[in-house]
């Protein structure tokens, strides 16, 4: 049975989500559909494309450290360098990106996208899903596919599954109270590293929540069993 794994809005908590995603890499994700918005897009697209989560995180931190660009440009330029066409293909109909469309009266409407024409279209979609006016750039909205788009958070669906399947939701306050200021976009790489480790450790401490929905990858499970046998000997 297909499971939907949902990553909510995040701001700087994208680093926390990536820590969780490093743990999820140990599980069988072959029958999983991901949905997400804002920084919650990153773990979704990386887990679908089997990229190494920690390597991605280390590289984006290095990029952030050496860039004075807005978050809009950081995300766009870094993903353009990092992602391959194969990564985009791995996300076709396996990742549901949540966006907020501003209608003619600038009122928010929920929109989802799960297929893309090419790598450029894919990256533009993710950038739009992450766009918070003023905080991420100097525009009021992003133009995407001819529509006025902002972060999916503004349509109130970031915590809501898209499908009717069994789901596993990750949001900032799932396992602990998170001060709202932690969600503000930050380029403090030391702070972002601490959030990553916090997410990783919280996932391990609450592993039963994950194991109630996902099964460990068979290769990883066999390795764990073999390690246990060696320890008993």
What is the meaning of each model-derived region?
Residues 36, 40:
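Gly/Ala-rich beta-loop-alpha elbow adjacent to hydrolase catalytic centers
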Residues 1-35, 45-233:
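Patatin-like phospholipase
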